[in-house]
Amino acid sequence: MNRINILNADTANKIAAGEVVERPSSVVKELVENSLDAGAKNITIEIQNGGESLIKIIDDGSGVHPEDVEKAFNPHATSKIKDTYDIFSINTLGFRGEALPSIASIARVDFKSKVSDFDMGKELVISGGEKESLTDCSMNRGTQIEVRDLFFNVPARKKFLKTTARESALINDLVNRISLANPDVSFKLFNNNKKILNTYGNGKLIDVIRTIYGKSTAENLIYFEEHKDTASVYGFIGNDTLARASRNNQSLFVNKRYVKNRSLTVAVENAFRSFNVTGKFPFFVLFIDTYPELIDVNIHPTKSEIKFKDERFIFKVVFDAVHSAMREYVKDTFTLPEEEEKKFEALKEEVIQESLDEEISTLEKLKENINYKVSEDRKKEEIYSYNPSKDYEAKTEVNIPVDFLSKENQEESFSINNSLENNNFKEGSAKREISYDPILIKNELKDKVSESTSESLERSDYKCNKNEYGNSIEEIIYREAKFPKLRVIGQFNKTYILAEYDSTLYLIDQHAAHEKILFEKYSSDIAKKRVEIQPLMIPLVVTLPTEDYLYYDENKEIFEKAGFKISDFGDNSIRIEEVPYFLDKLNPTELITSMINNLKKMGTGETVEVKYNKIASMSCRAAVKANDVLSILEMENLIEDLRYINDPFHCPHGRPTIIKFTSYELDKKFKRIT
């Protein structure tokens, strides 16, 4: 039978350390919070090797009394509370007395501190929980603590650490959040002796935001605030230009403590989406000040989670504050141009001048025209002989930057397409329900075209040369067409291409189709290491937030192989010199920012191939859009390119690119048959 044992202090501290000290950023959090509780106004953080080799914190707080230096490293020793009642009215960031003994048990610690009432300070050296020395030292008022060789005596914990770059990024993100919560404190962060962050400590939150996230972010913020009897809510929310695909740029503080609360995050997002339908997550910095008695922070060892006595009330206050600010912002930015007002007034006067009889006559004729069926004497030839290209000739054409077949080889390729077109692909059954399933369309068309395609390819005698995209003709011609050549009829709503083949009408989403072409082309080029690049006439210098720069630096090789030529420009700035050829019309700054955000969402566990696919998906932004007018030739080229990609039936996001209606289905819809 197992007997109950009393654990020794070392074992108990290491168990406690497992809860409190998860990684280097946990150490930084606990020590910086101690500095803030001591009233420090200047805090310097230095790290080496992602915090594993060294974490050094220097502050100008009140310091630790000489007689309490040793006592501070005893378990549950704290100056923050005295009894149980204090737990329910906590005004400090720390209170458990677990951090220092937990850290000292798994690292080598050099602790120095001095209070203003004494001429000398005290220095305590501890290694693995064992005191090595306690001596006097000379220093200014405040505290300095060095934590070296983290987890040196618990090597199993090291296996769970991420890369040095990632651990550094986590520390940087943590210090950024703490800086936002304390704009009246000056923070300096050094990583491997390089200054990463320096806030002014002037008490202005907007200055801290500008330092961390950049000038453009600070210029696109909306301030909000709401005050109630038991809670005050205030902060900034970004407009739609700052919305991102992840929640990385969301910060929530309760009584200056950085916490995570799903309910309050949803409150902000719901208020934001009342005025924006981007589907992305808003940037926000939210502060909630309330009485300590109305919250409970003692539910998690890291104090990162919090409970409210009345969470529904807080939810409503947050929602109302953000919603009101967004409503005023939209109202202020919406203005009717004076020119449009003048046109409206002129038109109104013109209508008033018309006689009542003429208005009645006009309305009656309009009613007759709406309810009147198509005249019997209108010939079908007039409908089917209509040439849509005439309407498009006078409009601006949209260039499609991807064409798998070069202009020199298009003529030759038409011989194959014509041979496919001349074959009779008959419907297997006339009576079928209308189908929107791209898989069914794919399988049906693939069966129809495969046999004829192989016969046509056997008869073709193309020479193996390179086209303008670097693909050999062999690579292009001997790729199977996934559906037969369609005849373009026109464009509907400047969004869908109408085409026909063998008594079947096809609707192609021009944006979805083009983005899939670009996606497969770009993915293939990355895999084969032959991405064609486009030099920028004027290189762009982009200053990134520190966290974004660290992600870029970690994935620098990914960007290079994806066709970007980027060089460091100092102080978290990068210089964009070249981009992939078909992305040159996009905003490189927004493109790089979006790619970094996508990589941040993926984390470090994904493979290089997955990251390449994620970057390739950004090619969607270069695709033709809905409401882009295309000429007949452009639509034909788009469909021709679509035929030869690996999966022409889905866009990169999984949506269908093609749907079809058979003649039978249309006849049934018009009740020509029963």
Swiss-Prot record:
GO MF annotation list: ATP binding; ATP hydrolysis activity; ATP-dependent DNA damage sensor activity; mismatched DNA binding
Keywords tagged on the record: DNA damage, DNA repair
Gene3D superfamilies with a match to the protein in the record: 3.30.230.10, Histidine kinase-like ATPase, C-terminal domain, MutL, C-terminal domain, dimerisation subdomain, MutL, C-terminal domain, regulatory subdomain
Protein family (similarity comment): Belongs to the DNA mismatch repair MutL/HexB family.
SUPFAM superfamilies tied to this protein: ATPase domain of HSP90 chaperone/DNA topoisomerase II/histidine kinase (SSF55874), DNA mismatch repair protein MutL (SSF118116), Ribosomal protein S5 domain 2-like (SSF54211)
Segments passing through the bilayer: none
SMART domains xrefs: DNA_mis_repair, MutL_C
Pfam family, one: DNA_mis_repair
Protein name: DNA mismatch repair protein MutL
Function: This protein is involved in the repair of mismatches in DNA. It is required for dam-dependent methyl-directed DNA mismatch repair. May act as a 'molecular matchmaker', a protein that promotes the formation of a stable complex between two or more DNA-binding proteins in an ATP-dependent manner without itself being part of a final effector complex.
GO CC terms: mismatch repair complex
Gene Ontology BP term (one): mismatch repair
Origin: domain of life: Bacteria
Source organism: Clostridium perfringens (strain ATCC 13124 / DSM 756 / JCM 1290 / NCIMB 6125 / NCTC 8237 / Type A)
